[in-house]
């Protein structure tokens, strides 16, 4: 199942409530402010702080 990019208009980072960006190659949503990545499983973003992974722009 593909991620619906329209969700980006309504979802926010659960930590800072900031904007998330879609990383299609890695199937995750990125919060650049908190440097966290949230996985997308079967088209559904897992927006739980304890499930986030550190994000590195170079990765």
UniProtKB/Swiss-Prot annotation:
Q: Which SUPFAM superfamilies match?
A: Trm112p-like (SSF158997)
Gene Ontology annotations for the cellular component aspect, listed alphabetically: cytosol
Q: Name the source's superkingdom.
A: Bacteria
The UniProt entry's sequence similarity note says: Belongs to the UPF0434 family.
Recorded hits in PANTHER family, A to Z, give: PROTEIN PREY, MITOCHONDRIAL, ZGC:162634
Protein's UniProt name: UPF0434 protein Shew_1640
